Amino acid sequence: MRLIYIFMVSIVTTLHASSSAILDPNDVKFTTKNVESPDSSDAAYVAGRILRGTDGNVNREQERKILLKRKHKRHYYKPSHAHDSAGSEAFHSAKKALKSSIRATKARLVPPYQRR
């Protein structure tokens, strides 16, 4: 009986947390404040933040630099493409991390006298 009670409380807590995260008006205000121009890339910026999850700890300046870098490369993302670009960024960063960990592992496997 006690196990069932703990299980039910955990479900209710999870549902309450997820519904409050979705319906929290502070999140909506936070995301709408970031729209500074009707430019499509700015809309993609906001859409990407919504899809990644908006919280106060997001480094907005770093994301703005990434957005400016994209603008100079003449990449303009529509809001529908924001999810794809966020996914591709995550994929490329994971790929870089994997390559660097492989290099570090190879460096450890090579004896010190054979390193260049």
From Swiss-Prot:
InterPro entries: RXLR. It is found in: Secreted; Host cytoplasm; Host nucleus. Residues 1-17 form the signal peptide. Disulfide bonds: none annotated. Keywords: Host cytoplasm, Host nucleus, Secreted, Signal, Virulence. Its main location: secreted. The keyword Protein biosynthesis does not apply. Induction: Expression is up-regulated at later stages of infection. A motif (RxLR-dEER) lies at residues 49-64. GO terms for cellular component: extracellular region; host cell cytoplasm; host cell nucleus. Transmembrane segments: none annotated. Belongs to the RxLR effector family. The RxLR-dEER motif acts to carry the protein into the host cell cytoplasm through binding to cell surface phosphatidylinositol-3-phosphate. Effector that acts as a broad suppressor of cell death to interrupt plant immunity. Inhibits cell death induced by cell death-inducing proteins, including the PAMP elicitor INF1 from P.infestans. This is Secreted RxLR effector protein 9. It comes from Plasmopara viticola (Downy mildew of grapevine). The gene is RxLR9.
